[in-house]
Amino acid sequence: MKYKDLRDFVGRLETIGELRRISQNVSPVLEMTELCDRVLRAGGPALLFESKAQHEFPVLGNLFGTPRRVALGMGVDAQAGEGDGAALESLRDVGRLLSALKEPEPPKGLKDAGKLFSLAKAVWDMAPKTVSAPPCQEIVWEGNDVDLARLPIQTCWPGDAGPLITWGLTVTKGPNKSRQNLGIYRQQLIGRNKLIMRWLAHRGGALDFREFALQNPGKPYPVAVVLGADPATILGAVTPVPDTLSEYQFAGLLRGGRTELAKCITPGVDGLQVPARAEIVLEGFIYPQEGAPSPAPAGAPPRPVKGASAAYEHALEGPYGDHTGYYNEQEWFPVFTVERITMRRDAIYHSTYTGKPPDEPAVLGVALNEVFVPLLQKQFSEITDFYLPPEGCSYRMAIVQMKKSYPGHAKRVMFGVWSFLRQFMYTKFIVVVDEDVNIRDWKEVIWAITTRIDPARDTVLVDRTPIDYLDFASPVAGLGSKMGLDATNKWPGETDREWGRPIVMDDAVKQRIDTLWNELGL
């Protein structure tokens, strides 16, 4: 189903009972987090906080708090009563689409050639279009009117350093690429018009910024942040879209209609384009540092001094409660100065929180897991299922089900998964099992681990590999080890012993008891 903007999606959710309006006064300082957390854990609806007692904008929370709403946002109209299972299964179709776009198979005949041409035409037809007089610029704040404190920016946890923008869709462009990058990076409020842009070094926005700083030393770097885009664009920014396809094009494919864009209006930022029907847009720059920077506080990490980007204004970010369930360390990141804020009339502020799973990122991880499966199966046909348990903080542990064909096969699959998608670069643990193990049932996975693994033979340790920057368990920030567990049945060459045969009841006996079951009244 097509959703032209966030309001359209909110209306649809309300119609099908997936959104609740909250008229009571709920503070964006801690209270919204507690309420959204309880509702998410209960599998409840999205929440629209409408009270203006403390702020002038309604706040939308828990938007993607169930896999069904993620599927709806991706254009899959999961029916009421089907549950999250049906929604997750439908998301594999999105994965098959991505798989075809990433590595299209050569046509086997005229019919296949026609399908390939139709897919290519669909992608071409989804090229975004620029519109004039966009709704996202109905209201413009400039000069001293630019005051981020007027937005209901959440403070999520008691130990947080301050208010935090959590669902900002950051738009950047590097000097060496024709396409824009869309990324979701948290942003700490530190002043009337200043935010800390927390993008990690490997993320697209940080790469664009470094390349710009190298080629344009001393020049301000333009940035736009979108708050409240349509669901297809938001989800396109967190999906492994092929490098040859822009997130705006992919959003158009999901939506079934071209993405309408608007040029930013701030001089110097007008080279960036944002969704024309976005609720709120922040426009501005990362400026070069003026004068000597103040010294780092006692006990804080040193300021960045290497690289062209170090010459730009930076500030100490955090600590903040994160998706790991812990407060992260403080670190230096660039400062984004907001020069203009544009918005729609009666704009909606879209927000979330992150914390110990389950949270909204964990739910997104469960949903995107289904998108990953066809991508992996296209590359590794022996993989029969794949699961990222939400308790593993979205991606830190993966369970792989496979059809094993030779000794050492499971280890090949481990290294294949680690190297296939950027998303799996930070997966610390991979457990590989056979087809007879339900990888979504921890009881079965633990049974396979404890009965099919010899720790010395079946454990793979890889040291000094890229690790999530937030993983404080690693000995060095961003660098740590990985573990693979081969919980498959062992083949000749992997063991000299007679391997155990699983106990299975005779089918005829099971059928006989099936017929007696109702009579027995058990």
From Swiss-Prot:
Catalytic activity: a 4-hydroxy-3-(all-trans-polyprenyl)benzoate + H(+) = a 2-(all-trans-polyprenyl)phenol + CO2
Annotated residues for binding of Mn(2+): N181, E247
Enzyme class: lyase
Keyword Transport included in the entry's annotation: no
GO biological process: ubiquinone biosynthetic process
Entry GO terms, CC: cytosol; plasma membrane
Gene3D superfamilies from the UniProt entry: Single helix bin, UbiD C-terminal domain-like
Subcellular location field: Cell membrane
Chief place where the protein resides: membrane
Database matches in NCBIfam families: UbiD family decarboxylase (TIGR00148)
Family recorded in the similarity comment: Belongs to the UbiD family.
Protein name: 3-octaprenyl-4-hydroxybenzoate carboxy-lyase
